[in-house]
Amino acid sequence: MIRSSVMGPTMFLVVLLLIASHQTSAWSLDGLARIEKLLSTSSSASAASPTRGQALNLKKRAILDQSCKGIFDRELFKKLDRVCDDCYNLYRKPYVAIDCREGCYQNLVFRQCIQDLQLMDQLDEYANAVQIVGK
């Protein structure tokens, strides 16, 4: 048999937990509602992000870069993309990664990234890769 002296504090604790749980879920729902409202009012988010079905129908080349009209070589793209990723990690500025890939890597930012990453000894190798994927 449970004593009433233990029952009182236990019952109080259970009620307190129920109230806290209800308040936490209300905060979560409010936050979710704010995020959904932001996403629904954002014109760029709805226009830029395709639905899942559309994303699956994209060609492999479209995922990487529309401006690359040359030979689709996954290893070359990975190598060139790695330069831009490393350059982004060096500077931590989103525009560095975007500008580095612009024009299928045929730009001054990509060349500057090669220089800043101290890859100038491999410049000819990267230049050939850019020519192959960007023809």
UniProtKB/Swiss-Prot annotation:
<feature type="disulfide bond">
    <location>
        <begin position="68"/>
        <end position="104"/>
    </location>
</feature>
<keyword id="KW-0313">Glucose metabolism</keyword>
<dbReference type="GO" id="GO:0007218">
    <property type="term" value="P:neuropeptide signaling pathway"/>
</dbReference>
<dbReference type="GO" id="GO:0005184">
    <property type="term" value="F:neuropeptide hormone activity"/>
</dbReference>
<feature type="disulfide bond">
    <location>
        <begin position="84"/>
        <end position="100"/>
    </location>
</feature>
<protein>
    <recommendedName>
        <fullName>Crustacean hyperglycemic hormones</fullName>
    </recommendedName>
</protein>
<comment type="function">
    <text>Hormone found in the sinus gland of isopods and decapods which controls the blood sugar level. Has a secretagogue action over the amylase released from the midgut gland. May act as a stress hormone and may be involved in the control of molting and reproduction.</text>
</comment>
<dbReference type="GO" id="GO:0005576">
    <property type="term" value="C:extracellular region"/>
</dbReference>
<dbReference type="InterPro" id="IPR000346">
    <property type="entry name" value="Hyperglycemic1"/>
</dbReference>
<dbReference type="InterPro" id="IPR035957">
    <property type="entry name" value="Crust_neurohorm_sf"/>
</dbReference>
<keyword id="KW-0527">Neuropeptide</keyword>
<dbReference type="GO" id="GO:0006006">
    <property type="term" value="P:glucose metabolic process"/>
</dbReference>
<feature type="disulfide bond">
    <location>
        <begin position="87"/>
        <end position="113"/>
    </location>
</feature>
<feature type="signal peptide">
    <location>
        <begin position="1"/>
        <end position="26"/>
    </location>
</feature>
<comment type="similarity">
    <text>Belongs to the arthropod CHH/MIH/GIH/VIH hormone family.</text>
</comment>
<keyword id="KW-0732">Signal</keyword>
<keyword id="KW-1015">Disulfide bond</keyword>
<dbReference type="InterPro" id="IPR031098">
    <property type="entry name" value="Crust_neurohorm"/>
</dbReference>
<keyword id="KW-0165">Cleavage on pair of basic residues</keyword>
<keyword id="KW-0027">Amidation</keyword>
<dbReference type="Pfam" id="PF01147">
    <property type="entry name" value="Crust_neurohorm"/>
</dbReference>
<dbReference type="InterPro" id="IPR001166">
    <property type="entry name" value="Hyperglycemic"/>
</dbReference>
<feature type="modified residue" description="Valine amide">
    <location>
        <position position="133"/>
    </location>
</feature>
<dbReference type="InterPro" id="IPR018251">
    <property type="entry name" value="Crust_neurhormone_CS"/>
</dbReference>
<keyword id="KW-0964">Secreted</keyword>
<dbReference type="GO" id="GO:0007623">
    <property type="term" value="P:circadian rhythm"/>
</dbReference>
<keyword id="KW-0372">Hormone</keyword>
<keyword id="KW-0119">Carbohydrate metabolism</keyword>
